[in-house]
């Protein structure tokens, strides 16, 4: 997923990198089926041979019916060729809804998350840690967010949280309506 007229540049496009690179992806994240737990790895044979040695001891079983379902779904190229446009529209919808708030919108050029800085909202809650702010946002405003600090190995307080816009438009509009009241 890449937006704003840009295109993804995989390391696999460059022969000197492709020979020593893995391409890893998750169907779950891309196609809204996270519970299915289906992904894939592609690499040159010499790397795949080594990868399989490790993988066989990390995965007990596969979800075969879902693999068949995904294979059928992928027969129509539009399902994956139009993904960037699909998510870009959702991103733009959320961004335009938050444009006149005091949330500082950070760039979101290729993801289904919109990161925002909440520290300039001018409310007492804007002084909370990002984890506490997200709890307040979820409990009191009924909008879920994740602090980006949750993904750091060392505690970092940046005042940045992320919203997922891979949602139905009605869900996004409801969140926008609530966030505009802050």
Predicted segment positions?
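PLP-dependent class I/II
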Residues: 1-182
